[in-house]
Amino acid sequence: MKVKVMHGTPFLLLAALAATGIALAANPILPLWEYIPDGEPYVFDDPDNPGKKRVYLYGSHDTSRNAYCGYDYTLWSAPLENPSRWRCDGVIFRSVNDANGRPLTKSGKGDLLWDPDAQVVTEKDGKKAYYLFPFNVQARQRLGMVAKSSRPDGPFTVCNWSKTDPQKVESFGFHLATFVDDDGRAYVYWGRDVGFGSDSVSAAELDTSTMCTLKPGAEIRRNVVTSWRQKGEDRYFEGPSMRKIKGKYVLVYARHTAEGEFGLAAEYCTLAYAYSDSPLGPFKYGGTLIDLRGREKGPDGKTRITAAPGGNTHGSLCEVNGRWYVFYHRQTGLNEFSRQAMVGRVNVTVDDRPGGKVSISEAEIDSIGFETEGLDPFELHAAGIACYYTGPVPARRRPRYAYSGPYPVPFRCDGYAAKNAYGPDVNRCVLVNCTDGSVAGWKYFNFSKTAGKRGLKLLVELEPGDVDGVVDVWVKRPAANEGGLKVGSFRVTRDMPGGLQTVEVPIEALAAVKGREALYFTFSSPVKNRSICTLHTLRFRE
């Protein structure tokens, strides 16, 4: 099998990529330079296009780089009819000045902002008001802050400053997750690991005239979902988010798994749900919605991790064009401070009778986002959207992140690249540490587009490492004994010129494959624990 290697400088290669551009609609769903974790997705009216709606993603912003989150909320949205085309709506909120316009902090940066929530309320005059619920994590006197706007994309202005202290807000002092029911009544949910009032979920009715205090006479319901420190299967950790589905109330939350659950160590890397006939409970545990570890059963019957070994994730459910998705975030790199927004499709079944069950399937970690038919093989894809990456030794999170095989690393660019958000110079995410015995995979490609075609080639942009190695290309699964089909192979040698190279791999056998299938690379080398290459991009060509 003859493999062609095309040499070139990084500048020339980027110029070539610019002719095609990195594909949209992959998972992560936003440009690969952007880091919006803790996403709360909502379908709201598009204020600039009457009669149209958009999906808005309200989340934190991982700009600190060496700590969770940042000092602004930056909003992204997509048209409901095409949820693959995300647009940066800019910074919608900062907590910088007090009620009198004076700086809140000596540094001038303002409050560090963690996971927010948002709601829309129809006011007495029939106009819609949008509320943002920031989490000023380091400013206890501003916990429970509420900001208001006439548009879903802001800007949002604080509406609950204290009448006596310009640096405080009027609230009952917790970080809030909120929900407005069809009848206009509003509810609030709170609970975080110790230090923020409660480590299980409490709930109460909210006063809609303030959106920051409890309704007079409201009863606080404690332990509506129990914590991981209590008995039971709920095992709530943090991040409550309420949704209503066919008359049932579904509470999504970050769950701390038990030791040995799923055959793995205890971690807080899953989203789960509980459901009820009432917004105030009682709630019944439903199951797992997503597990960042991408767990699967190996040929030996043991559970193995095929993605990150742990790390937090937050998110919620959203119906988009009649299909339900769980929005969550994944981890990149060797810390938890560059988290990327992801989606996974789920199936929802509701028994709408009193006490009826809500069944929601667990989503698979994949690379396709809203492209449910699979990625277009003829488009250019960043290698870092890989959803499957394993090494010869299982990855670990403690005492620090360590991978014996590939993993995606974050790419940062200064400022916002909103004007050319998907440009090849910024929309980049590479896969590093491709060692002997490791596997990288992308689920899924739409190989119906390549079926029956002759002369197919796979173009792989990479940087050679300092050891010789072989990369085998598989579809379906990464090994023959698992049902995989090997369709190509190429060598990477240490005497290749440095810098970016494009390897052209004949893959004639792919013509016999049809439908939505996974693509895998397996790596082998006589030298252990050394990277054969760093993967940048891949695409197919006739």
Could you describe each region identified by the protein language model?
Residues 10-21:
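Bacterial N-terminal signal peptides
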Residues 24-542:
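Carbohydrate-active catalytic/glycan-binding domains of CAZyme proteins
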Residues 1-12:
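Bacterial N-terminal signal peptides that target proteins for export
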